[in-house]
Amino acid sequence: MTDGPTFLPPPPPLSDRWALFLDVDGTLVPFADDPAQVYVSPRVISRLASLATAMDGALALISGRQVEVLDRLFAPLRLASAGLHGLQRRRAGEPLAVPPPPTGTLQQVKQEALALAAGWPGALVEDKGEAVALHWRAMPEAAPVLQAFAAVAVTRLPGYQLQPGDMVVELRPGQVDKGTAIEAFLGEAPFHGRFPVFVGDDLTDEHGFRVVEERGGLGVLVGDRTPTVARARLPDVAAVHAWLGAGD
């Protein structure tokens, strides 16, 4: 594990022989106080379409967002995608399997979280269907309260776990993560047998870095978070765009 990402080299130039996996928030788009307010530029969408074609479809989005939300953000593209940290997964051009509806307890937790966040203007509860995320980017002072709530709430949800992130904590089903999603894609065409590369910024992306590195591929960290198992680094979203060929 690398302790000093500032000294990691940049990734090599893109190759159409790769299997390319891309995180979204903090990688392809900057973080926003409200996740619903992010915007993907037409230039990035156009470049991803070109790359997916050049790679024979071996390009996938790996995100904590729902796949349905990714489709709206990157419209008209419908790329291979994993959502909710691997709970959802869809091959390019195929329908998304519909997961079972949330439990009554999860719905109750969501309502309690909304009531709690209402007392902290700027705190945000993001309903992800089978998961729920508590954000405090616009209200950092709410972090201890939201984290404490999440720590208790997860004990009421059998099979769920806490997933900390960048100014967010998420309650989501366990047994899956971004690494398991990437691993599943790598077992299928058109990803199978290719050099795997995963680009991401957050703590949740370490699962994906670990999988591609164990398979002889490359993890690319965006930013300067430490420690990391990634072996290459890009400093920010603008650098990711430039590396992809979608820069200004």
Tell where the protein language model's regions lie, with residue ranges.
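Short amphipathic alpha-helices in soluble, non-transmembrane regions
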Residues: 109-113, 145-155
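Histidine/lysine/aspartate-rich catalytic loop segments that bind and position anionic ligands
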Residues: 150-169
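Asp-based phosphoryl-transfer active-site loop
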Residues: 11-33, 61, 182
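Substrate-recognition "cap/lid" segment bordering the active-site pocket of phosphatases
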Residues: 82-111, 163-193
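Mg2+-dependent phosphoryl-transfer enzymes with acidic/Ser/Thr/Gly-rich catalytic loops
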Residues: 2-5, 15, 41, 174, ...
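A generic structural motif
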Residues: 130-136, 168-172
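Active-site phosphate-binding/coordination module
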Residues: 39-126
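Short beta-strand
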Residues: 123-127, 161-164
